[in-house]
Amino acid sequence: MTEEQKPTSEKSVKRKSNTYWEWGKAIIIAVALALLIRHFLFEPYLVEGSSMYPTLHDGERLFVNKSVNYIGEIERGDIVIINGDTSKVHYVKRLIGKPGETVEMKNDTLYINGKKIAEPYLASNKKEAKKLGVNLTGDFGPVKVPKGKYFVMGDNRLNSMDSRNGLGLIAENRIVGTSKFVFFPFHDMRQTK
């Protein structure tokens, strides 16, 4: 090897190692960003069971917006994902009552602080219940929601474990986030209401 060839070869090795280093940095940054986004902003969740039918179906996957825990506020009617007793169990329900509110159900009508609240997302379920000659939601309450807690129910009121039975009132720190979008199955992608 001549002296003229030697520097070119060293430059080539140096260029290759720089290229590998640049690619490595880009991959590390991309993975770190993906982990941060998943932990703090958005995460996919699987719907298990029929408690939110017909709004959500068993086996659907939805994106959960976790940013409501840091900025914004959870609103009545939002679909929320709730941590269960173990890290592998999550519940998907609809937020009905907020801290300080009084929740009551009479004759299939929701009342918050004595004021009638429309629930348009229940229209098809109420129609089916009426055909069967039953109320979709049994009467209950009034229930005063304490500070730091939320009252939730599934849309499939005849088949839902929620704040009325089993789950109880939900502590604010158990709410993972809200969902506004189903992304799987792909042929049925949609916003949730």
Curated annotation (Swiss-Prot):
Swiss-Prot/TrEMBL keywords: Cell membrane, Hydrolase, Membrane, Protease, Transmembrane, Transmembrane helix
Catalytic residues as annotated in Swiss-Prot or TrEMBL: 51, 93
Lineage of source species: Bacteria, Bacillati, Bacillota, Bacilli, Bacillales
Similarity annotation: Belongs to the peptidase S26 family.
Compartments reported by the entry: Cell membrane
Extracellular side stretches: 43-193
Catalytic activity annotation: Cleavage of hydrophobic, N-terminal signal or leader sequences from secreted and periplasmic proteins
CDD domains membership: S26_SPase_I (cd06530)
EC number: 3.4.21.89
One GO biological process term: signal peptide processing
Entry's Gene Ontology molecular function annotations: serine-type endopeptidase activity
Record's keyword annotation contains Metal-binding: no
GO CC annotation terms, alphabetical: plasma membrane
Gene: sipS2
Domain of life of the organism encoding this protein: Bacteria
Regions that span the bilayer: 26-42
Principal place of residence: membrane
InterPro entries according to UniProt: LexA/Signal_pep-like_sf (IPR036286), Pept_S26A_signal_pept_1 (IPR000223), Pept_S26A_signal_pept_1_CS (IPR019758), Pept_S26A_signal_pept_1_Lys-AS (IPR019757), Pept_S26A_signal_pept_1_Ser-AS (IPR019756), Peptidase_S26 (IPR019533)
Name of the protein this chain belongs to: Signal peptidase I
Repeat in keyword set: no
Cytoplasmic topology ranges: 1-25
Source organism (scientific name): Bacillus amyloliquefaciens
Membrane topology: Single-pass type II membrane protein
